[in-house]
C-alpha cells in the first residue's frame, strides 16, 4: 500500500490535529488519574485509622475501583473533543485551529475540575466522614454569604487553596511541555489511510468505549459499585470529587421528587413495621396511638421545653474522649442530677434533616422550601400539643429565612416563631453572626415566655434551636468561660476541627445549663419538663472504626418535675434515638392524645421484641445490640455493640436481626407522601 505523509493530502491539517488531540488527552487522563490516586492516598493517611490497614484486600479493591471510576469519568469528559476532531478529519477545509482551541479549553477545564474537586472531596470527607453528597447542594439554600465563612473556617483552608493553585499551575505547565513534544513527533509519522483508520481511529475508539464504561461485563460502573467494604473509611476512597458531586446531585434531585402513596404500599409497610396486618378501616389513622388517660395531667398540664443544640456531640461530654476538662459547663450538674441517656443517636448528620425528622416525622428535608411548604402535616409534633390545648412556640437563634423555617414551622402548628431578627429587636445588645444571633438570648426569651405563664393559664410547648456552635465558631463577647490547657488526647482528634469549636461547644452547653438552673430555682421547677439533645454530633473529629457510634452520638437530657415522674426507674443506658424523644414527651405530659406511633417511651419498660426497640440514624440501624451500617441504602453486616458503645472490630457472624427498624424510613416517607397527596386531592375538589 502506498504510504502517505499526512502532510500530503487535503485533510492533512485536520488529521495531524486529531492525533495531537488524541495523544494530548491520553496524557491528560493519565496525569489526572495520578493526581486522583495521590488524593486517595492523602485521604487514607490523613483520615483513616491504622486498624483499618488490616483490611488490605478491601483497600486495594477500593483503589482499583476508584481508578476505574477515574478512567471512566475522565474519558466521558474528554470524548466530545475526540469525536469532534474525528468528524473534522474528512472536511475539505482545515478546522484545526478551532478544534485545537476547543480541546485546549476542554483539557484545562478537566484539570481544574479534577484538582479542585479532589480537594473539596478530601475536605468534605475530613469534616463529614463521607464523600460529597446531596447535603452539598441542599446547603446552598443557606446562601453564599453564610456558607463562605463556614467553608473558610476549615483547618488549614489557605494551605489547601495554595496547594490547589500550585498543582493546577504545575499540571498546565507539564501538559504544555508534553503537547509541544508530541506535536514534533507527530509531524514525522507516515501512515497509509487504512492504517490510519484502523490504528488511529478504530482501535482507540474501541479502547475508549470499554474504559469509558468502566467494565467489560454486562453492567457499567454505577452507584452500586461505590461500596466495596464494610469499612466506611475504605468506601470513602472510591469516588473522586467529580463522581461524588455527580451522585450527590442525583440524590439531591431525587429527594425533591415525592411520589403518590398507594394504600397497598402503606398496608405492606404497616405489617412489616408493626408485625401484624392493618384492619380494613382507613389506614392512615392506624399509624397513630394514644397516650394513657391521666386526670392529674388533665388538671396540671406541664410546660414542655425541647432544646435542639447545634453539634452537641456526646463524646465531648465523656472523659474518655475529652480528657479531664469540663466541656459541659453548668450543664454538667444537671446531667448528673437528672436523666441522661448516653447511648443515643440523632436522626441525621444534618440540622435540617434532623429538625424535620424530629418535629414533623418526615425524611423529605427540602419540604420546608418546596411547593409543599404550606401543607399542614398531622404528624407534626406541634400539632399534637396544639390538639392538647398547648400554645406552641419556636425560638431559633438563626435567621428566620434559613430553609424557610419560620414560615414552614408556623404552617406545621407553631403559633409563634421567633428568629434572630426578632431577637435582635428584643435584645439590642445581641451580636450577630453569619448564621444569626447568640444562643444566650434564646434561653432568655424562653424563660420570659415561661414566666408569663407561671400561673398556668395555658401550657406551653417550646422548641429551641441554637447556632453558636457552628462553623466558623465565633465565640460571643459574653462568653467568659475559658478552657484550661486542652489535653493532648483531645487535640489529637481535631483533624479538620479548629480549637475554637471547643469554646463555642462549652459556651452553648453552659448557657443551656444556666437556663435549666433558672428554671429549677423558680416556681417553674414544679411544672416544666426540659429536654435537650443535639441536632447531630460535632463534625471533623478523628474516630476509628470501633468508635463509629460515638462519632455520631448525641446526648439526650431530660428533667422531669417530681410530681410528673412515674415510680419506674428508666434505663438511661439503653440504646435509643431521636425517634423516641417525642413519644417520651407525649406520654409524660399529655393525657389521651393521639400521636404518631413511631417511637417508644423511654421512661417505660421496653421488651426486646418491642416494635420500637431499635435506634435509627440515616446511616445506621442499631437493633438487638448490633449496629448495621447503611451504605447506598444497603445494610452491611452488623457489628456487636459493646456496653461502652464501642463496636467490635470484626462483623458479627450471626444472622442479621434487623427487626422492625429496616422499614422505619419507608414508613416515614409513606406517611408524608400520603398527607401531601391527600391535601392535593382535597384542593382539586370543586
Show where each model-derived region lies.
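Transmembrane and membrane-interface helices of multi-pass
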Residues: 2-257
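Residues that form generic nucleotide/phosphate-binding pockets
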Residues: 66, 70, 149-150, 173, ...
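Short alpha-helical "patches" and their helix-cap loops
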Residues: 97-98, 257-267, 371-374, 598-600
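The feature marks either
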Residues: 231, 238, 243, 247-292, ...
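Solvent-exposed soluble domains appended to multi-pass membrane proteins
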Residues: 275-686
Amino acid at each position: 500500500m502506498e504510504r502517505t505523509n499526512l502532510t500530503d493530502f487535503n485533510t492533512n491539517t485536520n488529521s495531524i490535529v486529531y492525533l495531537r488531540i488524541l495523544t494530548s488527552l491520553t496524557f491528560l487522563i493519565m496525569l489526572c488519574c495520578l493526581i486522583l490516586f495521590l488524593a486517595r492516598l492523602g485521604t487514607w493517611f490523613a483520615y483513616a485509622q491504622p486498624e483499618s490497614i488490616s483490611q488490605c484486600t478491601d483497600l486495594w479493591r477500593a483503589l482499583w475501583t476508584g481508578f476505574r471510576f477515574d478512567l471512566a469519568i475522565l474519558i466521558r469528559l474528554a470524548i466530545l473533543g475526540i469525536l469532534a476532531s474525528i468528524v473534522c478529519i474528512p472536511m475539505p477545509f482545515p478546522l484545526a485551529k478551532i478544534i485545537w482551541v476547543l480541546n485546549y479549553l476542554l483539557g484545562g477545564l478537566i484539570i481544574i475540575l479534577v484538582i479542585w474537586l479532589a480537594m473539596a472531596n478530601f475536605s468534605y470527607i475530613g469534616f463529614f466522614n463521607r464523600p460529597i453528597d446531596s447535603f452539598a447542594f441542599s446547603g446552598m439554600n443557606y446562601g453564599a454569604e453564610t456558607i463562605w465563612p463556614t467553608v473558610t473556617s476549615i483547618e488549614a483552608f489557605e494551605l489547601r487553596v495554595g496547594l490547589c493553585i500550585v498543582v493546577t499551575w504545575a499540571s498546565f505547565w507539564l501538559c504544555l511541555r508534553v503537547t509541544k513534544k508530541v506535536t514534533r513527533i507527530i509531524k514525522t509519522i507516515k501512515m497509509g489511510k487504512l492504517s490510519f483508520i484502523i490504528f488511529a481511529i478504530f482501535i482507540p475508539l474501541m479502547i475508549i468505549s470499554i474504559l469509558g464504561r468502566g467494565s467489560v461485563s454486562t453492567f457499567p460502573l454505577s452507584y452500586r459499585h461505590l461500596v466495596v467494604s464494610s469499612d466506611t473509611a475504605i468506601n470513602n476512597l472510591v469516588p473522586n470529587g467529580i463522581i461524588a458531586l455527580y451522585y450527590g446531585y442525583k440524590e439531591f434531585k431525587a429527594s425533591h421528587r415525592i411520589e403518590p402513596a398507594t394504600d397497598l404500599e402503606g398496608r405492606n409497610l404497616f405489617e412489616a413495621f408493626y408485625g401484624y396486618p392493618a384492619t380494613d378501616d382507613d389506614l392512615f389513622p392506624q399509624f397513630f396511638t394514644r397516650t394513657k388517660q391521666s386526670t392529674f395531667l388533665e388538671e396540671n398540664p406541664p410546660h414542655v421545653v425541647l432544646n435542639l443544640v447545634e453539634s452537641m456531640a456526646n463524646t465531648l461530654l465523656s472523659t474518655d474522649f475529652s480528657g479531664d476538662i469540663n466541656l459541659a459547663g453548668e450543664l454538667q450538674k444537671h446531667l448528673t442530677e437528672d436523666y441522661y441517656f448516653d447511648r443515643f443517636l440523632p436522626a441525621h448528620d444534618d440540622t435540617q434533616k434532623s429538625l424535620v425528622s424530629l418535629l414533623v416525622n418526615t425524611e423529605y428535608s427540602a419540604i420546608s422550601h418546596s411547593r409543599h411548604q404550606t401543607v399542614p402535616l398531622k404528624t407534626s409534633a406541634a400539632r399534637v400539643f396544639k390538639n392538647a390545648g398547648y400554645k406552641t412556640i419556636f425560638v431559633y437563634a438563626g435567621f428566620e429565612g434559613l430553609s424557610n423555617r419560620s414560615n414552614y414551622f408556623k404552617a406545621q402548628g407553631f403559633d409563634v416563631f421567633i428568629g434572630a431578627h426578632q431577637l435582635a429587636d428584643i435584645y439590642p445588645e445581641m451580636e450577630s453572626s453569619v448564621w444569626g444571633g447568640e444562643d444566650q438570648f434564646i434561653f432568655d426569651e424562653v424563660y420570659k415566655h415561661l414566666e408569663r405563664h407561671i400561673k398556668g393559664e395555658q401550657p406551653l410547648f417550646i422548641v429551641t434551636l441554637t447556632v453558636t456552635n457552628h462553623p466558623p465558631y465565633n465565640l460571643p463577647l459574653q462568653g467568659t468561660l475559658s478552657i484550661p490547657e486542652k489535653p493532648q488526647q483531645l487535640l489529637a482528634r481535631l483533624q479538620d476541627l479548629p480549637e475554637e469549636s471547643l469554646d463555642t461547644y462549652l459556651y452553648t452547653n453552659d448557657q443551656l445549663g444556666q437556663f435549666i438552673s433558672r428554671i429549677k430555682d423558680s416556681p417553674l421547677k414544679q411544672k416544666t419538663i426540659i429536654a435537650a439533645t443535639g441536632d447531630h454530633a460535632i463534625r471533623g473529629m478523628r474516630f476509628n472504626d470501633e468508635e463509629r457510634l460515638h462519632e455520631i452520638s448525641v446526648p439526650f437530657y431530660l428533667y422531669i418535675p417530681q410530681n410528673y415522674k412515674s415510680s419506674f426507674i428508666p434505663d438511661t443506658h439503653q440504646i435509643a434515638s431521636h425517634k423516641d424523644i417525642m413519644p417520651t414527651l407525649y406520654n409524660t405530659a399529655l393525657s389521651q392524645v393521639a400521636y404518631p406511633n413511631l417511637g417508644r417511651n423511654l421512661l417505660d419498660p421496653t421488651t426486646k421484641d418491642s416494635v420500637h426497640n431499635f435506634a435509627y440514624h440515616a446511616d445506621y440501624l442499631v437493633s438487638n445490640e448490633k449496629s448495621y451500617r447503611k451504605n447506598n441504602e444497603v445494610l452491611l453486616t452488623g457489628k456487636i455493640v459493646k456496653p461502652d458503645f464501642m463496636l467490635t472490630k470484626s462483623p458479627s457472624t450471626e444472622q442479621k436481626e434487623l427487626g422492625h427498624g429496616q422499614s422505619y424510613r419507608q414508613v416515614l416517607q409513606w406517611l408524608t407522601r400520603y398527607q401531601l397527596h391527600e391535601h392535593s386531592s382535597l384542593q382539586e375538589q370543586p
